[in-house]
Regions:
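Cofactor- and metal-binding active-site motifs of prokaryotic enzymes
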Residues: 1-203
């Protein structure tokens, strides 16, 4: 069984916004920590402070995400805000990885990401997916996807996108735990015995 929660905050203080997101996750999922939390946050926040407050409040086992340009859930949307998707599941096994130095060596960054994948070591989970978030301003997004596909022998379906910064085009970040990192790519690996669908929609 899989339980999910999509949460949103328009609070402007980084620590307060992080606590607000974490509190909403706890209200939705109960006392047990989420297996994974995916965070999208405006560049107006101090991301390290925001992420630390989220972690201290709802204690996700894995947290990834990126800076963004407009944040939303199914009920709310805005700019200069933050949102997150949390889930806990008995049907999906998750892990996370990061590749740094995308600009200098995107192939190495891809190898570092794939080194964290558990699905290449087991046949227990026939369906393998990964959410990929990359620093858009570091470039090489297309080559990263190609390299990830080759390194996984085409056995994974990938979804994701590039980090934003409220359309300033100055500096973008991906999130790995409580770190906000530029010039990097992060992945959330999702392993399951049943297929996962990927839906496409924007705006």
């Amino acid at each position: 069984m899989t339980h999910t929660a999509a949460v949103y905050t328009d609070r402007t203080d980084s620590a307060d916004a992080g606590r607000h997101l974490g509190e909403q996750v706890r209200e939705a999922l109960g006392a047990d920590a989420p297996d994974a939390l995916i965070v999208f946050a405006s560049s107006r926040f101090d991301h390290a402070v925001l992420l630390a407050a989220i972690a201290d409040t709802c204690h996700p086992r894995i947290m990834v995400g990126s800076s963004s340009a407009g944040e939303f859930t199914g009920q709310r949307r805005g700019e200069g805000t933050a949102s997150a998707l949390a889930f806990r599941s008995t049907a999906i096994q998750v892990s996370a990885g990061i590749g740094r130095g995308v600009t200098a060596d995107s192939a190495r960054a891809a190898r570092d990401v794939v080194a964290s994948f558990k699905g290449l070591e087991t046949r227990e989970f026939p369906h393998r997916s990964a959410l990929i978030m990359t620093d858009a301003l570091a470039g090489h997004a297309d080559s990263l996807v190609e390299e990830l596909t080759v390194l996984t022998s085409g056995k994974y379906q990938f979804a994701g996108g590039g980090a934003g910064d409220d359309a300033r085009f100055a500096q973008t970040y991906v999130f790995y735990g409580t770190e906000a990192v530029s010039d990097a790519v992060v992945a959330l690996e999702l392993l399951s015995k049943e297929p996962l669908g990927i839906g496409v929609g924007h705006g």
